[in-house]
Amino acid sequence: MKSTVEQAMLFEEKSIFENQAIEQGYSQVAGVDEAGRGPLAGPVVAGACILPRGKVFLGIDDSKKLTPKQRRYLYELLLEDPEVDCGVGVISVERIDEINILEATKEAMVQAIASLRSTPDFLLVDGLFLPHKIPSLKIIKGDARSVSIAAASIIAKEYRDELMRKLHVEYPEYGFDKHKGYGTAAHLQALKHFGPCVYHRKSFSPVKESIQEGVCQ
């Protein structure tokens, strides 16, 4: 585990894009990221986050690099801090099937930005170009390179995981609480046995195949 000093240095290193935007005259820089592009079931969720200038949040990192316990701690820390501005966007399975996952991801991001308390004047977006009236910068692997995007990734991931745990209560046979809708061996086996439920993405290959095979809830 990294020391407090090491974590503070890492936070500063990953603030380079935010600092550059501030130097260019922007004041409200929001990181934007998504969770749930790849799963076979459940919505796609986006997070947006504006971190207060001059405040260090130790441990902030790409949500995929954190343990569930670390991620939950940071999620609650971000939500409970009145100086942190967080937003979430959720796009349904029906909408994903209607317009495709990439466009649905962009819609979720736009929703997340709109749900912030304040209006950002610059966006740092993980991995894709986001058509928006607010100026933006696409950062490849941004969740590992920008603290604002990393914070947004934590918010999106934790929020979506909570949604998937709720779907598990409704459809426990699929194990949504464990794999969160991703195509694990156990999920594929359940899909083969039970067929898709209303929360499965019918435009995704394994789900589409099970429908063609006539396996339905």
From Swiss-Prot:
Superkingdom of this protein's organism: Bacteria
Similarity comment: family membership: Belongs to the RNase HII family.
Job description of the protein: Endonuclease that specifically degrades the RNA of RNA-DNA hybrids.
EC identifiers of the protein: 3.1.26.4
Uppermost EC category: hydrolase
Keywords, comma-separated and alphabetical: Cytoplasm, Endonuclease, Hydrolase, Manganese, Metal-binding, Nuclease
Reaction equations catalysed: Endonucleolytic cleavage to 5'-phosphomonoester
PROSITE patterns in UniProt: RNASE_H_2 (PS51975)
One BP term from GO: DNA replication, removal of RNA primer
UniProt: a divalent metal cation binding residues: D33, E34, D126
GO MF term set: manganese ion binding; RNA binding; RNA-DNA hybrid ribonuclease activity
Protein name from the UniProt record: Ribonuclease HII
Chief site of localization: cytoplasm
InterPro entries documented for this protein: RNase_HII (IPR022898), RNase_HII/HIII (IPR001352), RNase_HII/HIII_dom (IPR024567), RNaseH-like_sf (IPR012337), RNaseH_sf (IPR036397)
Cofactor(s) for this UniProt protein: Mn(2+); Mg(2+)
GO (cellular component) term, any one: ribonuclease H2 complex
Localization annotation: Cytoplasm
Residue ranges constituting the RNase H type-2 domain according to the UniProt record: 27-216
Cofactor comment: Manganese or magnesium. Binds 1 divalent metal ion per monomer in the absence of substrate. May bind a second metal ion after substrate binding.
SUPFAM superfamilies assigned to the protein according to its UniProt record, in alphabetical order: Ribonuclease H-like
Pfam families in alphabetical order: RNase_HII
